[in-house]
Amino acid sequence: MSNVSGILETAGVPLVSANWPQPSPPPAVPAGPQMDHMGNSSQGAPWLFLTSALARGVSGIFVWTALVLTCHQIYLHLRSYTVPQEQRYIIRLLLIVPIYAFDSWLSLLLLGDHQYYVYFDSVRDCYEAFVIYSFLSLCFQYLGGEGAIMAEIRGKPIKSSCLYGTCCLRGMTYSIGFLRFCKQATLQFCLVKPVMAVTTIILQAFGKYHDGDFNVRSGYLYVTLIYNASVSLALYALFLFYFTTRELLRPFQPVLKFLTIKAVIFLSFWQGLLLAILERCGVIPEVETSGGNKLGAGTLAAGYQNFIICVEMLFASVALRYAFPCQVYAEKKENSPAPPAPMQSISSGIRETVSPQDIVQDAIHNFSPAYQHYTQQATHEAPRPGTHPSGGSGGSRKSRSLEKRMLIPSEDL
């Protein structure tokens, strides 16, 4: 066979006809990243959990379950809105779950290089300040107001404790200035946090704010320092007030309430701090998504924070359900001689809960130069610490929405 091939080649006869079809070349392989049948990049951009449907689906399940549980509890309180001086603060505390959960979920859905999450997180952080103030105000209402509290603690020596941060107050006694400090420390956070939120949004618009950027030319460093100092002062005041009045608050079972609120705030605070440290140490690196967008390390840290909060809010909703039950208020409604119409009661309760009138009045009172001569007390007879105020249906809209206050000399307390 080889001899025949040689003879044909010598004679100039081609072995393959020119008219025969030539074999097609192999298909060209694109130089970019290869995509498998699942749509994930086989090389180049890694698979990112935070932007996956799995992360959004899991977080969504936790968020919507928490929303259903908490909204049902809020509805029960509005149906039995018999002690508005207490329940308006309870409802405000319960709202931390819908606001934290839904806000974090939206931030996770919009995670990307545009950093839309900064705007949502600002709303969440502002409500954090509102929660600290509302919890302190609820404790004041439990004990009958400033006048009733001072009647119990005034003149008593302050116990020195390193755990509660009173070791430097040895030899001092409680006075009206103590209550003023507790209120001012929480109210300042209600002022500082919105200012920092607006500042963050402005710096973000001008490209001067990036999460995790501790450069002295970046606004993140200064916003973080001011925020941490402000929230630490507010939490210290809340802790100090609980240390002082824990025996008076015992009938109201404050431990679960206190631990639940502190856990929600502290966990978000320390989680954010830990993630910032991990990002700073390079544990959380900058990544590139399959769409070609680059996500900074600070953006990823904020994304992990939002995902964790989505999961935690379900457990917070369950804990708050036990911490702030509505049975005691429902019993007062049953014993009421003339309960109001359900829809009227719910609508008026919502209006009173969302109204910031009491916060403005409290801020004016506690930062007034005349505070050292006066203290605040409700015109209705304040109950003794450890007892709920006497019932009534709360049906009178006027008596609930207009809580009259009078000033009496602190010397009379």
Swiss-Prot record:
<keyword id="KW-0968">Cytoplasmic vesicle</keyword>
<feature type="transmembrane region" description="Helical">
    <location>
        <begin position="47"/>
        <end position="69"/>
    </location>
</feature>
<dbReference type="GO" id="GO:0022857">
    <property type="term" value="F:transmembrane transporter activity"/>
</dbReference>
<dbReference type="GO" id="GO:0030658">
    <property type="term" value="C:transport vesicle membrane"/>
</dbReference>
<dbReference type="GO" id="GO:0005886">
    <property type="term" value="C:plasma membrane"/>
</dbReference>
<keyword id="KW-0963">Cytoplasm</keyword>
<dbReference type="GO" id="GO:0048471">
    <property type="term" value="C:perinuclear region of cytoplasm"/>
</dbReference>
<dbReference type="GO" id="GO:0008201">
    <property type="term" value="F:heparin binding"/>
</dbReference>
<comment type="function">
    <text>Acts as a heparin receptor in vascular cells. May be involved in vesicle transport in exocrine cells and Sertoli cells.</text>
</comment>
<protein>
    <recommendedName>
        <fullName>Transmembrane protein 184A</fullName>
    </recommendedName>
</protein>
<keyword id="KW-1133">Transmembrane helix</keyword>
<dbReference type="GO" id="GO:0031901">
    <property type="term" value="C:early endosome membrane"/>
</dbReference>
<feature type="transmembrane region" description="Helical">
    <location>
        <begin position="300"/>
        <end position="320"/>
    </location>
</feature>
<feature type="transmembrane region" description="Helical">
    <location>
        <begin position="187"/>
        <end position="207"/>
    </location>
</feature>
<dbReference type="Pfam" id="PF03619">
    <property type="entry name" value="Solute_trans_a"/>
</dbReference>
<comment type="similarity">
    <text>Belongs to the TMEM184 family.</text>
</comment>
<feature type="region of interest" description="Disordered">
    <location>
        <begin position="372"/>
        <end position="413"/>
    </location>
</feature>
<feature type="transmembrane region" description="Helical">
    <location>
        <begin position="93"/>
        <end position="113"/>
    </location>
</feature>
<dbReference type="GO" id="GO:0005768">
    <property type="term" value="C:endosome"/>
</dbReference>
<dbReference type="GO" id="GO:0030659">
    <property type="term" value="C:cytoplasmic vesicle membrane"/>
</dbReference>
<dbReference type="GO" id="GO:0030667">
    <property type="term" value="C:secretory granule membrane"/>
</dbReference>
<dbReference type="InterPro" id="IPR005178">
    <property type="entry name" value="Ostalpha/TMEM184C"/>
</dbReference>
<keyword id="KW-0472">Membrane</keyword>
<feature type="transmembrane region" description="Helical">
    <location>
        <begin position="258"/>
        <end position="278"/>
    </location>
</feature>
<feature type="transmembrane region" description="Helical">
    <location>
        <begin position="130"/>
        <end position="150"/>
    </location>
</feature>
<keyword id="KW-0812">Transmembrane</keyword>
<keyword id="KW-1003">Cell membrane</keyword>
<feature type="transmembrane region" description="Helical">
    <location>
        <begin position="223"/>
        <end position="243"/>
    </location>
</feature>
<keyword id="KW-0967">Endosome</keyword>
